[in-house]
Amino acid sequence: MEAYIRQKRASPGMVQASDLQINRPMSGMRSNSRELHAYDGPMQFISSPQNPDQILTNGSPGGITPVAVNTSRNHSNNMRSLSTINQEADLIEEISSHELEDEESSPVTVIEQHQQSASHSANSTQSQKPRARQHSFSDNLDEDDYTNRNVAAAAPVRPAGMASSPYKDATLEGSSNGTGNGTGGESEGDVIGNIDQFVMQPAPQGVLYKCRITRDRKGMDRGLFPIYYLHLERDYGKKIFLLGGRKRKKSKTSNYIVSCDPTDLSRNADGFCGKLRSNVFGTSFTVFDNGNKESTESPRLDLAVIIYDTNILGFKGPRNMTVILPGMTEDDQRVKISSADPKQQGILDLWKMKNMDNIVELHNKTPVWNDETQSYVLNFHGRVTQASVKNFQLVHDSDPEYIVMQFGRTSEDVFTMDYRYPLCAMQAFAIALSSFDGKIACE
């Protein structure tokens, strides 16, 4: 009986488990630095030149045992019923969809509760080991639309998973004062007072402001000079307009006007709040308020400086950025710093001289390379749904789990922007505008 069973199992028409590895055709995409091995879909399983009839799986979703099918027997001996063929087709489709789906980068995919918990646990464990800041050069891509998330050479920062509540593992700076951790110790912010005053006030500690930026590229000139609108998200899909920004047409360098009046985005408007100005190469941006450069009574104040690492050698990878802010006083007010005042130094000069007494330095959180998805990943906790080189999170080196600001794409012209203490809406919006601007030396 045993000999009969062994003979039966050795017959070529039987379905049997196999650990043999076949050399599958590599994906059509190529890169200079890394070869990408990936499944291209169900047709991948029948396009192998070594054995067109062999099916081999590396995983067993849903408890399905990997099998290898050999149909080298005579046609009369390996005729299978239609139901068996349909089952194999369903198996191929299920395995293919299981391997191609990822957790958050596909906005239409619904992740089960246990998968969300497992994803959050993995990301929490990963976040407890902060990586050293990589002073590498940013990638050389200037395109907004990253429809393929598996290009290794042009890998943008993309979401790494979803969680039941945003920022669940982000510790607040004031946790020692009893503000607590994550969403349990903070509330969602709302507009207090007039809009023009609110957008300039630093966010209170323990408050998270969830915002949305929409880009309007409709019209004659808006393809090159789009208008950006910032809204504060509220419950039930409601939103409150905060700021609007546009790029000035006649300017030697990139110059953005920011106003709380969406109908008049000019420097002479009553709602003018400030501006964002870059250097010639687009590697450094300075944010100013609406003060007068020549005035001594209300001089123009520096609100922030954004510096992007240059990419002279053309190294590929996510952008690296440094953000310098004015320091905060004991009563949570910004230190007044003015580069227009000849008696004091601006934020950029203080940072270059390593005089950090009255300034705060932030960095973008270093994304982690994921070999499975062949891309850089960050955990945006459900607030970002599409891959883009513009996606980033700002943190302080002393507390990499406290996300001061995060920004990322949700659709072609819609982006989310969330910020906390010590940023104000004007600072956060200007930082986001700098990521939209083209950068000659960074791309």
Swiss-Prot record:
Ranges annotated as biased composition (Gly residues): 177-186
Originating organism: Drosophila yakuba (Fruit fly)
Lipid biosynthesis found in the keyword field: no
Segments for region (Disordered): 57-85, 98-189
BP terms from Gene Ontology: protein localization to cilium
Ranges of Polar residues composition bias in the record: 68-85
Location(s), subcellular: Cytoplasm; Nucleus; Cell projection, Cilium membrane; Cell projection, Rhabdomere
Gene name of this polypeptide: king-tubby
Pfam families to which the protein is assigned, alphabetical: Tub
GO cellular component annotations of the record: ciliary membrane; cytoplasm; nucleus; rhabdomere
Similarity-based family: Belongs to the TUB family.
PTM sites of type Phosphoserine: 136
Membrane topology, record value: Peripheral membrane protein
Source taxon at top rank: Eukaryota
Name of the molecule in the record: Protein king tubby
Regions of compositional bias (Low complexity) in chain numbering: 113-128, 148-160
Keywords: Cell membrane, Cell projection, Cytoplasm, Membrane, Nucleus, Phosphoprotein
